[in-house]
Each structure stands twice: as C-alpha cells, then as structure tokens.
Amino acid sequence: MGFAKYQEDIVSRYVGDLAMRSTKEPASAPKKPCPSASNESDQRINKMSSLKKFAVATPRPLPVIVLADTSGSMGENSKIEALNAAMKEMVSTFAQESRLRAEIQVGLITFGGKAQMHLPLVAAHGVTGVSEFQAGGATPMGAAFDLARQLLEDKDRIPSRAYRPVLILLSDGQPNDDWEAPFNALCNSERAQKAVRLAMAIGPDADVAMLKDFANDAEAPIFKAHNARDIHRFFRAVTMSVTTRTASQNPDTSTAFVVPPPDDDALDLDF
C-alpha cells in the first residue's frame, strides 16, 4: 500500500504541474505568412505600369541644317535680303509646329569669307530671333562641308534616336577652296547618306553640277532660283515638306517636295 500511495502522489504532482504551465504560458500568436518573391515582383510591375500612364513621351529631334552661301556676290540684286526673309519665315513656322512626335531643330552654317556656325543646332521653338546674314568675302564651301559632317557625326548633338536629318545647300557661285574631298566625305558619311539632301542654285553662275551631286532626292531635283521671289518659294517648299513629316505617323518617311507657283501680281527682276 505504501508504494501505491507513492506512485499516486507522483502522478498527481505531474498533472498539477502541467495544469499550472498551461495557465501561465500565453498562447503564441499565429505566424503571418511571408510574402513570396513573385508577389513582390507583381506589386513592382503594377506600380511601374501605373507610373507609365502618367509619363509624357519625349519627342524625337528632326534636324534641319542649312548651308548658306553668304559670299560677296550674294549681296547683289537683293539675294541676301531675300534669303534673310525666307530663313526667318521658315524658322518662325517651325517654332509653331506640334512637338507630339518630332521636335524640329535648326542649324545654320554660313560660308562667306569663312565657314562658321551661324546658329548652333537648337530646337526651333526656342529660337527667339535669327541674326541676319551679311554678304562678303569668297566662297569657302569645302570648310562648310567639314562643319556639316562634324555636326552630323556628333552623337551628343544629333542622337541615334533622331529622325532623318534634312540638309540644304544653296549657293550662287563656285567654291574657291579645296572642296572636293570634304564634299565626298560629307556625302559618303553614313548619316548624310540617310539624310534628305536638297539644293538650290541661285542665279546663272552657281555650280549646278556640284549642287546636283549634293541633292539625293529624286522627287526634289536641284531648284534653280532666278530671282528673289524664287528663294522664298524654295524655302516654303522646304517648310511644307518638313512640317508634313512632323505631322505624319512616321516622320522618317519622305514627303513630296512641291514648290508653290509664283504670285502673278509680284514683279521681280531676274538675277
């Protein structure tokens, strides 16, 4: 009987201890499930998609680069005055164009006495005024070709995302420097080959053969300006061609180059 009583006491104390522990130790809180990596990735994607709805697409640049003869002979018969007026009209029209897909940029290279950047390549809408060309000096066209090639190949000025550039060459005379090598280097450069190249011969003394070699658009052969009015007509055609590209679904697509007819009531003497 003594041993049985001893076992009973041990069992009683063990059961009592268990009961006391169950009342003292609080129940542990349920563990929260850890988010899976896939859930976190989905959340990030959803946030990025929401931000894209509010992002504004940056228009791609469409460079228009003019190489203008400003030599002494351009000061005759109001040629330089007509050129100045036509340039201002073109840049002003470009500045008002929509920039939804393409942003027109304008750069002006002059060659008269020396070749120089008259207007660095800038967005047309940011041009507040174009200083007038002054006629004087000889015709260093080769140096102008070098400047144009360097500008075209400058990836900081004309990034790879830019639309096809427009190159415009106009002259009323013959180059008087070593121009053939720079001319070939420009025309054979990768970007110049892809560019739309337009040319205008002003007056009877222009180097028509060289200007024809420069122009590469079968739809826009060399334009011959016989008077000041023709200079305006040429640049209006340039303006229409470029602005039509900016409004199209694909501004890289070439557009028709149509020179408007002369005004019947406008009297103008030939150069």
Where are these regions (language model features)?
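Von Willebrand factor
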Residues: 56-119, 166-170
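VWA/integrin I-like adhesion module and closely mimicked acidic/polar interface patches used
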Residues: 173-217
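Short beta-strand-loop
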Residues: 3, 102-132, 208-216
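Von Willebrand factor A/integrin I-like adhesion domains
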Residues: 204-252
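Extended acidic, low-complexity intrinsically disordered regions
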Residues: 33, 203, 228, 250-271
